Amino acid sequence: MDSGRDFLTLHGLQDDKDLQALLKGGQLLKVKSNSWRRERFYKLQEDCKTIWQESRKVMRTPESQLFSIEDIQEVRMGHRTEGLEKFARDVPENRCFSIVFKDQRNTLDLIAPSPADAQHWVQGLGKIIHHSGSMDQQQKLRHWIHSCLRKADKNKDNKMSFKELQNFLKELNIQVDDSYARKIFKECDHSQTDSLEDEEIETFYKILTQRKEIDRTFEEATGSKETLSVDQLVTFLQHQQREEEAGPALALSLIERYEPSETAKAQRQMTKDGFLMYLLSADGSAFDLAHRRVYQDMDQPLSHYLVSSSHNTYLLEDQLTGPSSTEAYIRALCKGCRCLELDCWDGPNQEPIIYHGYTFTSKILFCDVVRAIRDYAFKASPYPVILSLENHCSLEQQRVMARHLRTLLGPMLLDRPLDGVVTSLPSPEQLRGKILLKGKKLGGLFPPGGEGGPEATVVSDEDEAAEMEDEAVRSQVQHKSKEDKLRLAKELSDMVIYCKSVHFRGFPSSGTSGQAFYEMSSFSENRALRLLQESGNSFVRHNVNHLSRIYPAGWRTDSSNYSPVEMWNGGCQIVALNFQTPGSEMDVYQGRFLDNGACGYVLKPAFLRDPNSTFNSRALAHGPWWTPKRLNVRVISGQQLPKVNKNKNSIVDPKVTVEIHGVSRDVASRQTAVVTNNGFNPWWDTELEFEVAVPELALVRFVVEDYDASSKNDFIGQSTIPLKSLKQGYRHIHLLSKNGDQHPSATLFVKVALQD
């Protein structure tokens, strides 16, 4: 069972020159610094899933010399990472390439012996990444099982002894009783050679991957027949799956897409294999397929949307000593983030730098960050990117900043009001492909004094401090002598159009005018929570026409996060989180912005866009938002849950928790029992029930943990889905890793019902 050959044949790549070169392997120069370049051997393994890298480190385990292609975010040709930009300028770009990983491990910067070798690696890896992504769940499952078989086949004779079979089951994360394993082994060993080969391994594979819960559901739908007719499939789609579009057209399109048997397809029928393929596909996912594209109205003012926003975007770790990196900006943009933070200070050689002021975090050039933003701003979404500037620079270096922004961003930069948009904020659609600046500004929407205006003006203490998040920095600003006050360069000020940073002076009372529509304030999480507690409805109304930015409290020097949900419930749009810090807060954040095609903008519910709204999440009364639902989740089973610690021999003991995040009365959590020693196909079949009063603000988080009686449970995987995007019926939930990346085959099988 050669999974690599299977993979190549499946995608017609068996004669591909690039992949042949990678399977053969070759020497590459690994680059770490100006003085550290070492030759190392790299080779694509036969499973076409992993790369082996030579290591000279003492005590290195064989597993640690492998990395999975599934962990690769991107392969870049040329000097396109900080490492190669700094340390390989002497080598032609066409020999240099970098492997950038999804998680927070270091980028692998490499130099090939020739341009042709570099091309083989870049194109070859690109093909595997592309084709792996296009495999359906059944193909992924088969490919994964084959690679586990290869690992277990210690003597490489393509046969499976009973001892190797036990190793194989451990690889699969399943503890099977020896007598049961021996029983299956004997059933499959037709040749009675005390080893399994070829068809015998296939038979074993089929017994292992049989899913009784799917068999049961299929039998119910067919009335115990071998296949589903179009009418039976329509009935299943209507009554179980609650599909609004259920009808013969949808049923036939599912048969066409997922039925592997040409005979069944010709007879307009679906077999059990086709049924499983459908349930494992995007059509059978718990997340509404229609919400994977932009489907909301994108023509409303910016203040009517939640905006995916990052705090201290330049950091990869904590705020005191962590590294700053342009890579952090690229990661945030690739995750759909639309508001980035740039903490700007004077740097050497008249070049502004970005870092966390008065700390030991490393420094990066402002121009390098702007270049990275230019290159990646619109890869994940076409909608506007807001650059939140925290400006500590001298006049001279502010002018350098303005010059870099203008020359590097060119027409992407919004540097004047849009025609006719002078009384309210423009919409995401009007700002498509544009980069906006948020920062201090002299005067109103139009530059003061035209051409002959002042060259620079002193900014008020309050407006300058309004932009400074760090309390130490803010108090320094407020105690500066007159000569040291921040003077703002007109060139930079004129680039701030619709996002002028101002000090928040309170909600206007009747008859007093508040902020201009293009003025916005920033609030620490504590101040925002206080405003929500004391004036929740006023905050909601303020946020109908004005943008509000929320940032983490100053004490969070470890870059921990706060819950964004309460801020969203108050209508706050730019709720900035530390994207570099995984955890439940980022899980919920990613879940919220998975909606609307993951474009980084999600339309707020109507009651958070109404200037006369009476909504207050802290004092919930009846209103248009009050549409109570009963949510019933039956957690049936799990599939291919990953090992928590790959170096441990232990098998996971999984349990599932389902959480509701929303207004405080809706917040709830229920859990299943623990299944011991089975991460491969655990079975719970447990019903969990919830009452949800404000479904438009609710998110459902499914968390799988490895139970540990003596310490904190280990995280295995999770998925967070807005309740409005959660599909009913029998569904698979595709689990994400701690860093928010998709586990290739890990799923939960559930049945969801939602009733008024």
Curated annotation (Swiss-Prot):
Ca(2+) 5 binds at residues 706-708. GO terms for cellular component: cytoplasm; plasma membrane. Residues 296-440 form the PI-PLC X-box domain. Residues 609-737 form the C2 domain. Disulfide bonds: none annotated. Ca(2+) 1 binds at residues 153, 155, 157, 159, 164. GO terms for biological process: intracellular signal transduction; lipid catabolic process; phosphatidylinositol metabolic process. Glycans are attached at residues 191, 193. Its cofactor is Ca(2+). Residues 21-130 form the PH domain. Its EC number is 3.1.4.11. Binds 5 Ca(2+) ions per subunit. Two of the Ca(2+) ions are bound to the C2 domain. Ca(2+) 4 binds at residues 651, 653, 677. The modification Phosphothreonine is found at residue 457. The production of the second messenger molecules diacylglycerol (DAG) and inositol 1,4,5-trisphosphate (IP3) is mediated by activated phosphatidylinositol-specific phospholipase C enzymes. Essential for trophoblast and placental development. Binds phosphatidylinositol 4,5-bisphosphate. This is 1-phosphatidylinositol 4,5-bisphosphate phosphodiesterase delta-1. It comes from Bos taurus (Bovine). The lineage of its organism: Eukaryota, Metazoa, Chordata, Craniata, Vertebrata.
